[in-house]
Amino acid sequence: MSPTSTATSLTDRFSAAKRASIALAIASNAEKDAALRGIAEGVLAAADSILAANAVDLATGRENGLSTGLLDRLTLTPARLQGLADAVLEIVALTDPVGQTVRGSALPNGVKITQIRVPFGVVGAIYEARPNVTIDIAALALKSGNAAVLRGGSAAIATNGVLVGVIQEALAAAGLPADAVQTIDDFGREGANGLMQARGFVDVLIPRGSAGLIQIVVTQSAVPVIETGAGVVHIVLDESAREDWAVDIVRNAKAQRPSACNAVETVLVLRAAAERLLSPVLGALTEAGVTIHADEIALPHSPGAIAVTAEDYATEHMSLDVSVRVVDDLDAAIEHIRTHSTQHTEAIVTNDLANAERFLNEVDSAVVMVNASTRFTDGGEFGFGAEVGISTQKLHARGPMGLPELTSTKWIVRGAGQVRS
């Protein structure tokens, strides 16, 4: 199963996506949901083909030296395919944002003004070794009335090709244009560069991947970008933190899925808490298979730890590695976060209300937490379904981006002959 688009050039594909976006913008919720159900069913029906293609990508990735974290993100299993299908069906159950009223009023002269949600048009996405993103973005774009042009990278080219074929067949079966979702992976780097310069065809571009990839897209794209930042995520442990909470939260945030962007990368322990918390927390991490990159104070508390480097503090490991630093006080912890954070997610474990409120007020990230695992930064966990990414910028959207964040707005003005005096 392969993509069904017959467009032979990048411009042809962008033009086809633009035309398809016009049809999607006025498609009914029933039509869009029918396509989504078809995608969910198609993913499961084509499981053998998808997994075979994924095996090819994984073998190539190992030959090319992909990191453990990227290989994990690249890997699909029957359970993960079922999870993808289930996630698409969850999107079916969500409220269609298109046409929703944001606000409205009636002027004294009787003119009625309403602001409503409308699709962006064509959403572009550039991402690395994440075939799940192919389904997530396509499904979210479809539900919100957008076409999608996907550049999933060479590492997942075989897998993404089969997945987009499944999506296009579901679109056609639902009476919607198959060109509404396209991959340009076959164009290689030319495709990525073309997508970044496709202003006039593509309305918004969303990069997902490493800090390097995101920075390239942000600096080189002529298309407006919604930045989904890398996750150099921090957890602070203060002197009042409960030991069991500190152990459970840090272990979950690092070891549950270390390749996730919301996994913790640096643990900051206040000096007053170091003697009490370092050994149990680092011991739990070691038992979970985590390599500790410790500063000179933390090193003696973790046999087998290695010395942390300055580069570690700015690294999204995407693996079972974590940096640990002992800092003088909450001031120093917040300053460290300001210096090294990618403004994704930060958390503090504390029983001190003043410290909690200060942390919430002074840390400027998309998601700031008290006494909870950073793994909760996720659209599904937040209760609004799948997300297209975690936005770390301040314009348009910030944090997990669900369906409403894939829309813009327009103003509807209804009059009865009024003119401006």
UniProtKB/Swiss-Prot annotation:
It is found in: Cytoplasm. One of its GO terms (biological process) is L-proline biosynthetic process. Gene3D superfamilies: Aldehyde Dehydrogenase, Chain A, domain 1, Aldehyde Dehydrogenase, Chain A, domain 2. It catalyses: L-glutamate 5-semialdehyde + phosphate + NADP(+) = L-glutamyl 5-phosphate + NADPH + H(+). Pathway: Amino-acid biosynthesis; L-proline biosynthesis; L-glutamate 5-semialdehyde from L-glutamate: step 2/2. GO terms for molecular function: glutamate-5-semialdehyde dehydrogenase activity; NADP binding. This is Gamma-glutamyl phosphate reductase. Catalyzes the NADPH-dependent reduction of L-glutamate 5-phosphate into L-glutamate 5-semialdehyde and phosphate. The product spontaneously undergoes cyclization to form 1-pyrroline-5-carboxylate. Pfam families: Aldedh (PF00171). It is an enzyme of class 1 (oxidoreductase). Belongs to the gamma-glutamyl phosphate reductase family.
